[in-house]
Each structure stands twice: as C-alpha cells, then as structure tokens.
C-alpha cells in the first residue's frame, strides 16, 4: 500500500499549489545558473512541515531534466557522508541522459552542530566546489547553527498552504480514489491539519481506505488535530493504543524525533507495554523489519521509508492480537527514556566533570598537556592535593568513584 501523499505528489512545478512566488524565485535562480550568470550556488527552501519544500525540488528536477541526487541531511550527518555526495556529483556522469544533476540536501535544520561534527563545514565545502546547483530544505532556517549556510544560500520561503489550495488537493485525491467525502468532513480535516498537506492526506487516506467514505462523525471520532510539538511519551501512547493502522502511522510520522531515535524509544518500551512474551516477540520482529527498511531507505531508495514507518508503527501496535477484540481496552503504562539516552547523558556529565578538574590542573599548561601528563599522576595522589584545587562536591565524588574502580 503506497501512501497517497507520495502517490499524488506533484511531478511538475505547474502542479505545485499555492507557492507561486517561491516557484518564480526558484526558476529565476535555476535559469541564471544554466546561463552561467548566477553568483549563488545554493538555495535554502524553508517553511512549515508539509508545505511542499521537497516536492518543489523534485518538481524542478523533473521540469529541467536534472538527475536528482538526494540526501536527508539529518540522517546522513557525518562529514564523510557529505563528501561522498560531492564526489558522486563531481566524478560520476549521469546514466539517465539528463542535462546534469541537482543536489538536494533535505532537512539541514536536523543537523546537530555539536554532535554531527564537520557536517555543516562539509556542506559549505560542497557549495564552494560544486559544479551543480544545490537545494537545501529546512523547517527552521533561523537555527543559530545554520548561520553560515544562510550566508551562502539564497533564502526562499514557502508559505503555509491555504484552505482553498488544500481543498483542491484533497478533492482531486477523492475523485481519483473514488472516495465520497462530506464537505463538513473536508473542512474539519483542513482545519485540523494547519496547512500541512501531508498530514491532511494521511487522515483522508486512513479513514477513506478503512471505511470507503469520509464523514464528519468519522473524522471527529478518529482524527486528532495536528499537534506541532508531540512529546515522545505521547507519541508512544498513540502508537501502542492505536485501534487502526493509520492512527499508529500518523503518530509515528508526526513525531518530533527522527526515525532512528523513535525506534530506540519504541524498543525500550515494548517490554513495558506488553506483558505476553509472544506479543513482545511479534513487536520486536516488526521493529527489526523497520530497521531493515530504514537502512535500505538511507542507501537511496527513500520510497522504502513508508514501509519502515508501517513496521515501527502499526506493526508494533498490532503485535497484541487481543486488540482486535471489540472489548479491548488500552493499558496505561509508565514509559521510560531509552537507556541509550541515559547512558549518553551520564557519559557527558562524567566527561564534563573530568574536564573541569583538568582545567584546574592546567593553570600553567595547555588542557591537552594537563590531560595527558598531569591528570594520570594526579589520580594517584589527589587526596593529598585536592584542597589546593578547591574541588566541589561533584568533582570529589567523581575522583572517589575513579579510585574505587
């Protein structure tokens, strides 16, 4: 089952709704690039989720016969991943007989500038050296970590999708799928989606495929209004408590954490949610399949991302056969953070405490010299000299734990 927002996404710029100004700016930029007159090598498309940023880039590639070289920047974050894109663009010729290539770096605001060391610098180097136009997308372009990218790129804003354009999109899909949708139900979906076309189409598909029609009563009882900030605990509850596959999938695709982290959250809490060992096994089996699809999607076949979401959401949600019974009721459980996050947090806290001690030791030397030369010996004799360093309670506890180990 293919998702409708993928099945009916615009193929050409002329089919993209409500973004006339953005389309005009993008076409002017690509025309100047093709004519050799552009001083700007990259564009940063920005706007709320579901307004068509990625679709606009794909449609541009289609209309200008470019081979699209696509990478989700928030998933392939390391410097080496960025460089591999540059090498492919620079070295390998197109096998599709196209004019050239268009590089798409999706979700650059998903890059963690602290953890993903070198990723931003890698993109800057790619922009500097590229022989092909680059399009980046972001929900939040004003992230402080993206300042250098903003300076290098032409900023093009996509507006929130209006009610009338969204209505046209949904009406076309209803006609194509032969789904009867009441006007009141359509209005409710449009209001609930807050201009997010993907979210609105997911609701339409979930109810339309499940019931063959979309009425106000069905929408009001089954569809949640769009929430921009979904707590991970709320996302888990929506997945585990879902009565329908589309509800579980909506929860997963609306999560404010990336797919990898969502899998960690689900994995940690499967044994908490399910009591029956067979239910637990089925849930982990679905989650392992999600990981396989996700790995293949990241290698370039992004259509498989939909199947990854199916497995990590409805696959996990319906691991419990009891849910199919009409008298089934959800069980409230106290979910917990992934131990992976707790370990990272604890590890960082320990390193920070250690570094504070080393800074106190490095009064007359560099930090690295104190770390490599002074610190190892200090650990052997710290009890004699700790008073001279004005160590706080946390630092003393750290040293005490080191000596015991």
Curated annotation (Swiss-Prot):
SMART domains: AAA (SM00382). It holds the Pfam family AAA. The keyword Nucleotide-binding applies. The keyword Signal does not apply. Keywords: ATP-binding, DNA replication, Nucleotide-binding. GO terms for molecular function: ATP binding; ATP hydrolysis activity; DNA clamp loader activity. It comes from the Archaea. One of its GO terms (biological process) is DNA replication. ATP binds at residues 47-54. NCBIfam families: PRK04195.1-1, PRK04195.1-5. Heteropentamer composed of four small subunits (RfcS) and one large subunit (RfcL). Probably interacts with PCNA subunit PCNA3. Part of the RFC clamp loader complex which loads the PCNA sliding clamp onto DNA. The complex possesses DNA-dependent ATPase activity. Belongs to the activator 1 small subunits family. RfcL subfamily. This is Replication factor C large subunit. The gene is rfcL.
